[in-house]
Amino acid sequence: MSDHTGDNEDNGKLLYCSFCGKSQHEVRKLIAGPSVFICDECVDLCNDIIREEIQESTTESTGDKLPTPQEISETLDEYVIGQKQAKKVLAVAVYNHYKRLRVGDKKKSKDDVELGKSNILLVGPTGSGKTLLAETLARLLNVPFTIADATTLTEAGYVGEDVENIIQKLLQKCDYDVEKAQQGIVYIDEIDKISRKSDNPSITRDVSGEGVQQALLKLIEGTVASVPPQGGRKHPQQEFLQVDTGNILFICGGAFAGLDKVIRDRSEKGGIGFSAEVKSKDSGKNVGETLRELEPEDLVRYGLIPEFVGRLPVIATLDELDQDALVRILKEPKNSLVKQYSKLFEMEGSEVDFRDDALEAVANKAMERKTGARGLRSIMENVLLDTMYKIPSEENVVKVVVDESVIKGESAPLLVYGNNDAETAKAVPEE
């Protein structure tokens, strides 16, 4: 411990930190104990050390137990409605991926089989739950997670984001801990938007389509990426972080509008001549049923290059959500919209009552807009706007009733007032 003394204007003694030896004039705060002192900088350092040790011990205690595919699927059920087959495919793929990492951490013998990485492609209509599935998986496994938008990516040297910026975002999520980032999950959204216009090789330079697919190949398969620590474009004077992407799980997702037609064209192809099998053009299948017949060759025909499709061996297709599924999404998940709005109104000392016909009307509106589950919140916000504007200023509102006529815009939500004598009700006047 440091034992410095000197002259001070007040008491003739200059105080020093017993740990780092800095004087009271060199630090912002000096805390006194029995015959010792500690400065604010040393307190911060101690807090950081304790925090790191707690995180390490937590990781070690939970790291041994990897949830089984069935447990993963059951957890996904709490947040995502329907999509049973997609959940099963995801659960098995993610379980095998992290089981592979556990094997990789142990010492390998000469005869050990090397397990390859299986990245995932999610194909489904907009608002069917692709992003939510990936987010829930990352939260369940307690690994770093980031979402990248494929439409903003360009080849290196062109205006736009380099593909390495995806890894830089992942590093940001885990405070630039490279080891942690190397076991994370990256979700690349709108992957269908980087498809080339035809399945023939492009003659002209396609810097945001086929060029991006080429740039993503090595990153997805596994390479040591040089990432600028503060993001942005690379320059020679900058030091880079080296991140091995070989153990990062890449999940790519896209709506692939028109892919069902590509699948139908392939499956309905017949021979020629009298013995050719004649197939009906209208089989009555919906988009979800058609997507289940997806083959890698359909993705190539759609505009993904064969090498890119080969890097995504696990394909999970999601069904289009029907009205019943949308109603269930509104009220069943842990973070459902009904529960969220109930909590918001509860904070104002009142409750909100969504009638069943109201939820069906919301689901019906979302289906008409073809926005899937993503459009549910905007409908609810629009319907409850006036009510949420007035409630904080009103007194004694104990209940808000929302029925089908409110969703259709025919009437306003009913406010129930609690008085000492009885309860009275009136509609919210429109602005």
Swiss-Prot record:
> Which GO molecular-function terms appear in the entry?
ATP binding; ATP hydrolysis activity; ATP-dependent protein folding chaperone; protein dimerization activity; unfolded protein binding; zinc ion binding
GO process terms (BP): cell division; proteolysis involved in protein catabolic process
Q: Does the keyword Protein biosynthesis apply?
A: no
Mind telling me which PROSITE patterns this protein's record contains?
CLPX_ZB (PS51902)
Q: Where is the ClpX-type ZB domain?
A: 5-58
Ligand binding (ATP): P125, T126, G127, S128, G129, K130, T131, L132
The record's GO CC annotations read: HslUV protease complex
Query: What keywords were assigned to this record?
Result: ATP-binding, Chaperone, Metal-binding, Nucleotide-binding, Zinc
Q: Which InterPro entries match?
A: AAA+_ATPase (IPR003593), ATP-dep_Clp_protease_ClpX (IPR050052), ATPase_AAA_core (IPR003959), Clp_ATPase_C (IPR019489), Clp_protease_ATP-bd_su_ClpX (IPR004487), ClpX_bact (IPR046425), P-loop_NTPase (IPR027417), Znf_CppX_C4 (IPR010603)
Q: Where does Zn(2+) bind?
A: C17, C20, C39, C42
Superkingdom, taxonomy of origin: Bacteria
Signal peptide start-end: none
- Supply the NCBIfam families for this chain: clpX, PRK05342.1
Classification via HAMAP family: ClpX
Q: Quote the subunit structure annotation.
A: Component of the ClpX-ClpP complex. Forms a hexameric ring that, in the presence of ATP, binds to fourteen ClpP subunits assembled into a disk-like structure with a central cavity, resembling the structure of eukaryotic proteasomes.
Protein family according to the UniProt entry? Belongs to the ClpX chaperone family.
**What does the function comment of this entry state?**
ATP-dependent specificity component of the Clp protease. It directs the protease to specific substrates. Can perform chaperone functions in the absence of ClpP.
* PANTHER family linked to this entry: ATP-DEPENDENT CLP PROTEASE ATP-BINDING SUBUNIT CLPX-LIKE, MITOCHONDRIAL, ATP-DEPENDENT CLP PROTEASE ATP-BINDING SUBUNIT CLPX-LIKE, MITOCHONDRIAL-RELATED
Record protein name field: ATP-dependent Clp protease ATP-binding subunit ClpX
Species in which this protein is naturally found: Saccharophagus degradans (strain 2-40 / ATCC 43961 / DSM 17024)
